[in-house]
């Protein structure tokens, strides 16, 4: 008798055929990689096929592969990864799609297939700059309105570009370039035998 993973793998290969770029198993879960051009069609098949029935998208995130692994990675830079759940069959599936263009990463939106992807896609847009084509309200979710850049990209500086502070003269919050002053930290060495009442 085939295991659940083997049954799911066979059902995916039968339903999707040549649209499967890769299908791998890791840590007891399958990862399905598809092309951006097939992404929407595959998502609808995963949801509607009676042998698959992935009714829920439970998570979606962006990934920046710029410095992936040992630095020898040569594939596309950005991907969107969805975690799917079939309540009917008690299956989970990781669906990954790579954006074909690294300079302007665009992938189709899954909002019409799974409405739960709405805010997840907004978060991935905000933090990674992934543009979800067809999204009804693609705007920033976590960063400030005037924020420049996408903070989870690997080429974004850790300190950021600007900092905000309250200006008492203008009586409002203002932005200014980041000011990080280098400082030397000298460890404090205590040489007293009974410092702070401690007994040795």
From Swiss-Prot:
It is found in: Cell inner membrane. It comes from the Bacteria. Keywords: Cell inner membrane, Cell membrane, Membrane, NAD, Quinone, Translocase, Transport, Ubiquinone. It is a peripheral membrane protein. Pfam families: Complex1_30kDa. It catalyses: a quinone + NADH + 5 H(+)(in) = a quinol + NAD(+) + 4 H(+)(out). Transmembrane segments: none annotated. Its EC number is 7.1.1.-. InterPro entries: NADH_DH_suC (IPR010218), NADH_quin_OxRdtase_su_C/D-like (IPR037232), NADH_UbQ_OxRdtase_30kDa_su (IPR001268), NADH_UbQ_OxRdtase_CS (IPR020396). One of its GO terms (molecular function) is NADH dehydrogenase (ubiquinone) activity. It is an enzyme of class 7 (translocase). PROSITE patterns: COMPLEX1_30K. GO terms for cellular component: plasma membrane. NDH-1 shuttles electrons from NADH, via FMN and iron-sulfur (Fe-S) centers, to quinones in the respiratory chain. The immediate electron acceptor for the enzyme in this species is believed to be ubiquinone. Couples the redox reaction to proton translocation (for every two electrons transferred, four hydrogen ions are translocated across the cytoplasmic membrane), and thus conserves the redox energy in a proton gradient. HAMAP family: NDH1_NuoC. NDH-1 is composed of 14 different subunits. Subunits NuoB, C, D, E, F, and G constitute the peripheral sector of the complex. Belongs to the complex I 30 kDa subunit family. This is NADH-quinone oxidoreductase subunit C.
């Amino acid at each position: 008798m085939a295991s659940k993973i083997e049954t799911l793998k066979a059902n995916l290969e039968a339903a999707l055929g040549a649209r499967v770029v890769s299908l791998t198993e890791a840590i007891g879960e399958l990862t399905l990689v598809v092309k951006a051009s097939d992404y929407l069609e595959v998502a609808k098949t995963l949801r509607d096929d009676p042998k698959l029935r992935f009714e829920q998208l439970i998570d979606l995130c962006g990934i920046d592969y710029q410095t992936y692994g040992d630095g020898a990675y040569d594939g596309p830079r950005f991907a969107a990864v969805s975690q799917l759940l079939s309540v009917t069959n008690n299956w989970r599936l990781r669906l990954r799609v790579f954006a074909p263009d690294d300079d302007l990463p665009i992938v189709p939106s899954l909002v019409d297939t799974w409405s739960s992807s709405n805010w997840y896609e907004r978060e991935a847009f905000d933090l990674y700059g992934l543009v979800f084509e067809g999204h009804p309200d693609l705007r920033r979710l976590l960063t400030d309105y005037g924020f420049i850049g996408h903070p989870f990209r690997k080429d974004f500086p850790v300190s950021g570009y600007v900092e905000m502070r309250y200006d008492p003269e203008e009586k409002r919050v203002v932005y200014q370039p980041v000011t990080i002053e280098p400082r030397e930290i000298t460890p404090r060495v205590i040489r007293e035998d009974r410092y702070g009442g401690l007994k040795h």
